[in-house]
Amino acid sequence: MAALSDTAASHAFHPPARTTYLVLILCFLTIVAEGYDIGVMGTIVPSLLADANWKLTPIEIGAMGSAALFGTLIGSYFISVVSDLVGRKLLLIGCVTLFSLSMIGAGCAPTPWVFSVARFIGGLGLGGVISAAAALTIEFSPPEKRNLNFALMYSGYSFGALLSAVIGMAFLGSHGWRFVVALGAAPLLAVPFLFYMLPESLDFLIARGRHEKAAALARKLGIAPAELERNVRDPLPKPSVGAVFREVFSKQNALATISLWVAQVAAVMVIYGLGTWLPQLMRKMGYDLGSSLSFLAVFMLSSALGGILIGRISDFLGTRKTIVGGYVIGAIAISSLAIKSGLIMNYVLVALAGFGSIGVAMVQLGFIANYYRAHARASATGWAVGVGRFGAMSGPMVGAYLASRGADVQWNFYAFAGSALVAAVAIALTRSPHWSSASMTAGAISLKS
């Protein structure tokens, strides 16, 4: 995932609204595609377990679910290098193409091993999509709209996972899991439109010294020449790794950094653990396949809407209090799913679980970004997100391990609820930044890939 920073990490262009909306919509759709790719695993888990040809165990399912997430971990380390070479536009298009093709491979896989390899390769592309999409969204948004547009763009992940659940309900019974997976290749149809309609990053063109092309693009997009000329004279600074390390692990920040990393790992473990196993857990609670997938749909829908709502709440109550409270609500809801309840009550609990996991995690990224000073903010947040990927890989394995040991389904909910509480405690123990809060840029978030 891209790292967040303040406006120092991106030039403050003021494009016309039509350009902002175009970039926002295109980037949102790429994140929807990414959400489908990752979320489809949870949708097909019950069908994979029932596949008589593969005869998979829960541990094998967990490993297959972690394959794409391991790919994102590896791919994320090469994002900045590739972005510097080809630009954010081509990086985004290349990543969309790669993970879409991998969905064809996974859908046609003759063995679980080939399926896992295809998912891993797709993960390499997934590691770059959010980075490039977020960077372009922020760059082509006016400073006062960057927070909102980032939240709208990032909500595409939940809508993509929601789409996978809806398609699963419609086609799993009649067409099987291979068809549902292969539909993840549909974004290939959008690649020509991305080439034609998505603008390249002006920051990238300026940094590469391609000033004439940057000027032509700025004219086409309706950006004032004076803005471009000012940014050509004042290129973005690139902080050294040493400077970032000293900020992140300074005497004042070291304990807070550890707490933030623990919170990120714990939160992401809940997100990917429930995202992978929730339908199967609800089947074990006595629901049929269609109903169990509807729980995943509710989980993802509530998380998408919850992230935006929680962002608004944090403006009034404060970010740290909101995050801690959100995780506590999520933990209570998740643990309450272990108690046999009616259908409507379970829908409410699952909605609160989505609100108190993915929704809160979206706000947590902003909290982490604003914890550090401007020169280290982008890289420091990227490091936290990178560490969090270990939670993404371990989440599916936790559910797999408990299932393989024959544990009652309730223990899955208790385990993920406990992880949410760990995230809440870690954020609660994080002290306020040692530097003046007056320096924080509450109104503008930007991303650097």
What would you call each of these model-derived segments?
Residues 1-449:
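Transmembrane-helix signature of 12-pass secondary carriers
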